[in-house]
Amino acid sequence: MTYLSSNQLKQYEDQGYISPIEVLSSSEALEARKEIELIEKKMPSEIDNAGRYNVHLISPKLDSIVHNSKILDAVESIIGKNILVCSTTLFIKNPNEQGFVSYHQDAKYIGLEPHNWVTAWVALTDSNENNGCMKMWPKSHLNIRDHNEKFNKGNLLTRGQTVENVPEDKVKSIELKAGQMSLHHPRIVHGLSLIHI
């Protein structure tokens, strides 16, 4: 069992996220990536821009990540034993493409209340400043913020939901190695930096 430590739980409560958490081996992460590439070739419509949701439903290999005991134990540490996977999303960074995810709060547009759920983000490749890692605004999970819908080219969010005036000097880069995970509160302001490949 891989339950979170008291220090990790305190970080989640105080900061709104925990990172990094080891959940997959490098070979498991590579196998998942190969599976996604296979789906892209054999069933491209299942994984295009509009179809990057719930791909675990068509792939036993990806479904095994959803049911990974290390992930579930960490999530259980935060929300308890009643765990429901509401959805999964793939953020795919293809070579020679630029993209980003604007700063937003999951709670604002997912519509699940109360906000006693958690988002698990599992890296299948290394995610760092050079290739576009997640960014979190610590302590921003204490309240819901206004969002604007901006349909900017390259934004990987379908509605372009954006929190304005995020203080970049307070934002933390969440660099992950393939197989590591971050957990974040549904109200934390977060995004994905511009991807330069």
Can you describe what each PLM-predicted range is?
Residues 1-112, 148-149:
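Non-heme Fe(II)-dependent double-stranded beta-helix
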Residues 25-26, 91-93, 108, 127-129, ...:
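Short, solvent-exposed loop/turn segments at secondary-structure junctions
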Residues 83, 98, 115-117, 129, ...:
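Coil-to-beta-strand transition motifs
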Residues 89, 105, 122-126, 138:
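Short, structured patches in soluble enzyme cores that scaffold and shape functional sites
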Residues 102-105, 122, 159, 167:
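Active-site glycine-rich loop that binds ribose-phosphate moieties when present
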Residues 111-129, 175:
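Short, conserved beta-strand element in jelly-roll/cupin
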Residues 129-193:
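Double-stranded beta-helix
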Residues 195-197:
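Conserved small/polar residues in nucleotide/adenosyl-binding loops
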